[in-house]
Amino acid sequence: MTPQSLYKVPSDIAENALVNNDQYKKMYQESIINPEGFWREHGKRIDWIKPYTKIKKTSFDDHNLSINWFYDGTLNASANCLDRHLEEHGDKLAIIWEGDDANEQRKLTYAELHTQVCKFANALRSQGVNKGDIVTIYMPMVPEAAVAMLACARIGAVHSVVFGGFSPDSIAARVIDGKSKVLITADEGIRGGRKIPLKRSIDEAISNPDVTCVEKVIVFKRTGGDIDWVEGRDVWWHSLMEVASEFCQPAEMNAEDPLFLLYTSGSTGNPKGVLHTTGGYMVYASMTHEYVFDYKADEVYWCTADVGWITGHSYMVYGPFANAATVLIHEGVPNHPTPARLGEMIDRHKVNILYTAPTLIRALMAEGKEQFSSYKGDSLRIMGSVGEPINPEAWRWYHEVIGHENCPIVDTWWQTETGGILISPLPGATDTKPGSATRPFFGVQPALVDNMGDIVEGTGEGNLVILDSWPGQMRTVYGDHDRFALTYFKTFRGMYFTGDGARRDEDGYYWITGRVDDVINVSGHRLGTAEVESALVSHELVAEAAVVGYPHDIKGQGIYAYVTLTRGIEPTEELRQELRQWVRKEIGALATPDLIQWASGLPKTRSGKIMRRFLRKIAANEVTNLGDSSTLADPAVIDTLIESRLNKTE
């Protein structure tokens, strides 16, 4: 590792951080050697109605799979996010909201948010919602989305948030699986200057003949646009709130009572409902938010994720509110109407902590540094990355242009299934390397195993597994515990299989190499697609790249690259050859792409995740049955890629 590629903890951060490197090592060691003692102490960071005496009862045996934390304690998640802050922080801002139009802004204190949540919790009860019922939420990025979630938690209902861009079929599948009687939506959302017909999508979902459970649809009036209305079923949010009481006693929930369902996106077949429970999740979301972002009282924290994803749940709602944070919520996208929007919002709201995704960083990179010429960024202290491995070139650009080389970057690795961050730098403790998620959080025991399940010691590469449970871990796949065991615990017995590959370097740092199915076997040698993608994107003319394997007569698999060039650059055969040589130089001859297809856009979900299964099929010339593309932000991208594919057979 060259000295230039190691970014030391800034001295001012180290002096004032929650933990330094020595403290991290001591706490981590304790959390592994004595997990019960460690979590017995740190479980106290949230408020309990009946304090726990039992800490951990877990088994990763796929025949006897069970995960229980703090399991004789009782609590309420909503009370932990609101009530416990009222005495000291009632007047503190809980939410700063900025609309798609920057001129539209709202602010809510903790006392005001508490009132809204209590009233809506009573409104839900008036519509027949009881403890244990699953309520489907399909909302835009407005404060009422968080209000709806916290109101469900307050009365012991289980929320199932569906991202506000999913298709009616996707909504229907989730409603059917959860048997939701009550749905919560808005007339329309606004995103990137466009109106999103949320209520229309809900109406279409309910018209599915298999949806027979829905009794009520609560509609928040966001735009006032024309919508269809079903008398007796549809009810306005504001009408319910006008008559709802401001007092709602929080329900006493067992630590292992369900808090929410969140369905994993992009899976084939039936949706997979990831079930998270109350106690362990709240402890873990709260603790990781404070330690990973080194959160200090009175700081403004901005997570750009949508509430429909796990990042929005853990690091826009439950973690920050449990810590009495001031949370910036943005309705739109941070590069609309211009790429300067991100910087403008950081300056306008004096944001101290920013948590965003590599896909946005690369999009901003492609627009050029000049978009940030008037950006000050002097309030910013910590920056985070989430959603996929960040390539080193994007990491450095983020560090230089957004962070002015002063802000540590926490490159966080975790999953919907993990509930919270598992591997990440801590700002005051961890020297960072661009592209590495670095070291595990407290209580997390990662390991690498080969394809036979044998542990890889020291430096090496393999399948990333976790050897023991942590409090934020999912408990089951809703309604299908066998599927939970099969998906995560049968591949490598007695271990949680993440589905990702990773390598560990000489410093014990972890580098996520991508999904295991994103590994290409070229002439018997394994290559992580993320590595080839990073090499391509490090070229100054490349904005984005996605790499997949395809059948090759000689090598077994060849390397097929989809490349998006920076704005204004024309694709040429000369540039294609230059990029092949560039990768050869960066990684080695083995990694040289066999085929490079120019791509004006890549197939992405609305959260920015590249859907590689489409790219693999197109590269393999299997274009007649690509499967459901309804979750893509722009399904038309697929047709363009098919038309210009390079592996056609006549």
Swiss-Prot record:
Residues given in the record as CoA binding sites: R191, G192, G193, R194, T311, N335, S523, R584
Modified sites of kind N6-acetyllysine: K609
Cystines in this chain: none
Keyword Lyase: no
Cellular component terms (Gene Ontology): cytosol
Record's keyword terms, sorted: Acetylation, ATP-binding, Ligase, Magnesium, Metal-binding, Nucleotide-binding
Name of the featured protein: Acetyl-coenzyme A synthetase
Organism name: Shewanella frigidimarina (strain NCIMB 400)
Lineage: Bacteria, Pseudomonadati, Pseudomonadota, Gammaproteobacteria, Alteromonadales
Gene that encodes the chain: acsA
